[in-house]
């Protein structure tokens, strides 16, 4: 589920049917259903959606024509290029960032920046896993995935100088691939990343420090390859879309396959489980613009849980501090050679990883591979 950042609207993605539902967040009334416009690519990927920053406008991309839902109905953006699998509104709401690129660029290295009215297409930096905007504005976070490691790429946005995001040198590095779009807390003090391709991980970082305050595996840790089928079944019972920040500062909610919502207090490092009304497995969890939690379960039921407090307002100071501690990359040079990487505990300046010569079994896969490559040189 993807909630509108300002209005009481929810977009629900049905990957089995390859359809998008639009609900009124105040009473969970269905406002529309948008069926897939193109056949499945066979990878189990459903449509991607993006809400307009202010208006009741939803873009739907599924590899065919990009379509637009409004309260008046569904229309096709006929001036847009076709073939996009993911889209995001730029902060000015007049441009759309889209992947994969349909220009002559390398799909890994660049994306498209499309004018919403004319369909005119320019180039932006590469990304592959959704775009998360900091609630105070001026900064976005997206992912660049690789089987060995995934980079969390930060970029300036909405500063009036360019419609494309401007990539910054400071970046996150996550083990392996297969992550979902990151989410920021309403007050902008935390960001959470749900993953990954091999096990159910959850990482939460403070912002702007990027210190890791929670790194855990949901359910049982991996028993190692080859994976027993019963472990795979239990692992796959967890929804990949089961986290949300509510109104209480520093609290992350986690939906479970046993019909509970876990209230995780990041500051006190404590958690408390709450039963959902149906007792069925949580299949999706999101927070509305007002801070209410919306829970979808395995029975198909949708429940809204009222917020217990007013939603916090993010301060621009955190973004200002983050930007002051980094700089733009040179768009004409190799990206990865310019990045200052952190995993939330350690930091590597450009060139540092080429000299790392030791790693333990507890280190992430990407770091152990890097050490092996350094020894082979």
Regions found by a protein language model. Name each.
Residues 11, 59, 97, 140-141, ...:
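Structural core positions within WD40/WD-like beta-propeller blades
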Residues 2-8, 48-56, 88-95, 132-138, ...:
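Blade-terminus and WD-like Trp-Asp/Gly-His loop motifs, strongest in beta-propeller folds
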Residues 29-32, 75-77, 122, 162-164, ...:
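A structural motif specific to WD40 beta-propellers
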Residues 35-41, 165-174, 216-236, 325-329:
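Surface-exposed loop and turn segments in beta-propeller and other repeat-based domains
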Residues 18-21, 65-67, 104-113, 147-153, ...:
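Structural motif
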Residues 1-2, 42-50, 81-89, 125-133, ...:
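Repeated scaffold domains used in trafficking and secretory/extracellular systems
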Residues 25-27, 70-73, 115-119, 156-159, ...:
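Short loop/turn segments that connect beta-strands within beta-propeller blades
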Residues 282-342, 347-376:
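Blade-level signature of beta-propeller repeat domains, shared across WD40, Kelch, NHL, RCC1
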């Amino acid at each position: 589920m993807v909630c509108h950042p300002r209005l009481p609207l929810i977009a629900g993605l049905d990957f089995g049917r390859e359809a998008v539902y639009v609900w009124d967040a105040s009473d969970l009334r269905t406002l529309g259903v948008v069926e897939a416009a193109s056949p499945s690519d066979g990878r189990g990927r459903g449509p991607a959606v993006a809400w307009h920053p202010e208006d009741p406008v939803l873009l739907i991309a599924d590899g065919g024509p990009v379509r637009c839902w409004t309260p008046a109905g569904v229309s096709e953006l006929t001036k847009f290029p076709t073939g996009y699998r993911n889209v995001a509104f730029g902060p000015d709401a007049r441009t759309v960032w889209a992947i994969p690129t349909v220009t002559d660029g390398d799909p890994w290295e660049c994306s498209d920046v499309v004018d919403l009215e004319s369909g005119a297409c320019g180039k932006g930096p590469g990304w592959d896993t959704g775009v998360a905007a900091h609630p105070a504005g001026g900064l976005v976070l997206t992912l660049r995935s690789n089987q060995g490691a995934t980079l969390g790429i930060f970029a300036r946005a909405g500063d009036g100088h360019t419609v494309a995001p401007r990539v910054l040198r400071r970046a996150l590095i996550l083990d392996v691939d297969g992550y979902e779009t990151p989410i920021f807390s309403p007050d902008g003090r935390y960001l959470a990343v749900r993953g990954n391709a091999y096990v159910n991980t959850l990482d939460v970082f403070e912002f702007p420090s990027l210190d890791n305050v929670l790194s855990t595996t949901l359910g049982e840790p991996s028993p190692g390859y080859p994976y027993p089928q019963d472990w795979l079944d239990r692992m796959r019972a967890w929804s990949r879309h089961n986290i949300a920040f509510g109104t209480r500062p520093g609290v992350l909610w986690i939906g479970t396959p046993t019909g509970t919502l876990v209230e995780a207090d990041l500051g006190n490092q404590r958690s408390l489980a709450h039963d959902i009304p149906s007792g069925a497995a949580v299949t999706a969890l999101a927070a509305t613009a007002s801070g209410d939690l919306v829970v979808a379960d395995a029975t198909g039921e949708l429940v809204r849980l009222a917020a217990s407090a007013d939603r916090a307002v993010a301060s621009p100071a955190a973004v200002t501090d983050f930007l002051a501690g980094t700089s733009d990359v040179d768009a004409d040079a190799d990206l990865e050679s310019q990045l200052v990487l952190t995993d939330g505990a350690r930091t590597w300046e450009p060139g540092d990883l080429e000299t790392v010569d030791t790693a333990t079994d507890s280190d992430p896969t990407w770091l152990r591979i890097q050490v092996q490559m350094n020894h082979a040189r």
